[in-house]
């Protein structure tokens, strides 16, 4: 007899089936890359992520290349990975790709103690980020939208 573990209020097999269906329904003209547990403050990384959203991939690489921020180097690597996923896994053309969305979520926080006067201490929170970049093919997206009409 198979014992099913509940997750998010539903049985595990149903959870995995729904997840598989959701992934299958994702458009084939889209590729993503995720970097998790990156040691940078989400607030600092979001300003860089906002600057490349909606831009062509080549333009986004140029923006990230000349940005002096630490987050730019990290997001550039994630973008490079998303483009490689699009080209290798989906066979998309790199010239037609654009940054569909780029967002930064909070990760866990490392807590450190900072000694203060009279034997007390303050807690310092070292924040982490989860960075997601999704690229899409403009031409394939237009063709898919025309087919729906």
UniProtKB/Swiss-Prot annotation:
- What top-level branch of life does the organism fall under? Bacteria
Query: What SUPFAM superfamilies does this protein map onto?
Result: Ribosomal protein L22
By its UniProt entry, which InterPro entries does this protein fall under? Ribosomal_uL22, Ribosomal_uL22_bac/chlpt-type, Ribosomal_uL22_bac/org-type, Ribosomal_uL22_CS, Ribosomal_uL22_sf
Entry's Gene Ontology molecular function annotations: rRNA binding; structural constituent of ribosome
Q: Which PROSITE patterns match?
A: RIBOSOMAL_L22
- One Pfam family of this chain: Ribosomal_L22
List this protein's GO terms for biological process: translation
Cite the record's note on assembly.
Part of the 50S ribosomal subunit.
Q: Which GO terms describe its cellular component?
A: cytosolic large ribosomal subunit
Keyword annotations for this protein?
Answer: Ribonucleoprotein, Ribosomal protein, RNA-binding, rRNA-binding
Q: Which family does it belong to?
A: Belongs to the universal ribosomal protein uL22 family.
Q: Please explain the role this protein plays, according to its UniProt record.
A: This protein binds specifically to 23S rRNA; its binding is stimulated by other ribosomal proteins, e.g. L4, L17, and L20. It is important during the early stages of 50S assembly. It makes multiple contacts with different domains of the 23S rRNA in the assembled 50S subunit and ribosome. The globular domain of the protein is located near the polypeptide exit tunnel on the outside of the subunit, while an extended beta-hairpin is found that lines the wall of the exit tunnel in the center of the 70S ribosome.
The name under which this protein is listed is Large ribosomal subunit protein uL22
| UniProt xrefs under HAMAP family | Ribosomal_uL22_B
